[in-house]
A protein has these predicted regions:
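Short helix/turn-capping signatures at newly exposed starts of structured segments
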Residues: 1-267, 271, 299, 304-336
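Residue-level preference for long, well-ordered alpha-helices that form the structural scaffold
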Residues: 98, 102, 284-291
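Short, intrinsically disordered low-complexity segments
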Residues: 267-289
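Alpha/propeptide regions of enzymes that mature by internal proteolysis
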Residues: 294-295
Length: 336
């Protein structure tokens, strides 16, 4: 496509196989210099910007950018660098055509990486889906920059990366979604207490999931429920479309809330759907916002007005547990 540059399949395959033989050590200056040489790239001496090195790759997508660990991070790790980013696809095409082309290329590259690396350890999305293969020293990430840029391949220092991401979560500086095949110990984001802010955050998560999960061939479900499993719950299922459900099994005085669900936009249970529900035709911003409001309104109808009374369960169709600190409420996993 005019206005795009990309690695060939052979170039990408050769690079991925070389990566499996390269040692990054402790991610110090000597380690990075040696690793860049082993990749067949030429390191440009001197910083191209504050905290950045540059390596000429010989690819038409351009140089690789090597990022130092920011001094303000104050990490326990002694690594001096934490990320090397290379564009697999560099795209200047705007609009829907550009977005569709970047998505197609991302899926093609993902297929090659699955062949070479096997199943990923972590998947997620923030401005486009990303996939990670992790070992204790090196994490390899493929990221679709959906709205601009193209498709990037990032080589990440595992320990510094995870410390920096944990610090960001504790500050509340986080967005998007993450799904783990094996969930590690993870920090909680500062709690959200305002229902309006929570609804906006939930809407953002649903927008991200609706755009991302079809690209990585899965589906996602987010459940909001009381921590005592009182049968008061709502859920959103993202599977190429968007569906919300509200429990039909609430008990006692809370059953009075069922009388409000029709007015909130829910359809009554049927043979195929035992819960109150509504399906949206797409996962657009408007649909996600409406879905989030319907979920929160149903919780209120069930007598839940305090976010401290609910937790979230979230998972993909492939069995991965999703981690959504952006919601600002506890996960069900953290309560066990």
């Amino acid at each position: 496509m005019l206005g795009t540059k990309r690695l060939t399949e052979q170039q990408l395959t050769d690079l991925l196989r070389r990566l499996q033989r390269v040692e990054f050590g402790k991610w110090g200056e000597t380690d990075i210099t040696t690793a860049i040489g082993a990749l067949g790239w030429e390191l440009q001496h001197g910083e191209v910007d504050v905290g950045m090195w540059r390596a000429e790759t010989g690819y038409e997508t351009g140089a690789a950018i090597i990022d130092r660990v920011p001094p303000q991070q104050n990490l326990a790790s002694r690594a001096q660098f934490y990320a090397i980013e290379l564009m697999v696809l560099r795209s200047a095409v705007r609009g829907e055509a550009g977005e569709n082309h970047r998505t197609i290329v991302f899926r093609e590259v993902l297929r090659i990486m699955l062949r070479e690396f096997g199943q990923p350890d972590v998947r997620g999305g923030d401005g486009g889906p990303w996939v990670r293969w992790r070992d204790p020293v090196l994490t390899v990430e493929l990221h679709l920059r959906r709205f601009h840029g193209g498709v990037s391949l990032r080589l990440l220092a595992t320990e510094p990366l995870e410390q920096m991401e944990a610090n960001a979560i504790r500050r509340g500086d986080v967005s998007g979604w993450t799904a783990y095949s094996q969930r590690p110990e993870l920090p909680l984001e500062p709690a959200v207490s305002d229902m309006g802010e929570f609804t906006a955050r939930l809407s953002g998560v649903l927008i991200d999931l609706a755009g991302d999960v079809p690209v990585v061939d899965t589906a996602g479900t987010v459940v909001l429920r009381t921590s005592d499993w009182s049968a008061r719950y709502v859920l959103a299922a993202v599977d190429g479309g968007l569906r919300v459900e509200a429990s039909a099994a609430v008990k006692g005085s809370h059953r009075e809330g069922l009388g409000y669900l029709s007015g909130l936009g829910y359809q009554q249970p049927s043979g195929k759907m035992p819960n109150w529900s509504r399906r949206f035709g797409d996962g657009s911003r408007d649909s996600a916002s409406a879905a989030a409001h319907m979920m929160v309104d149903a919780l209120r109808a069930f007598g839940i007005d305090d976010l401290y009374d609910i937790v979230y369960d979230a998972f993909t169709a492939d069995g991965e547990r999703m981690y959504l600190p952006v919601l600002g409420i506890a996960s069900a996993d953290s309560m066990t």
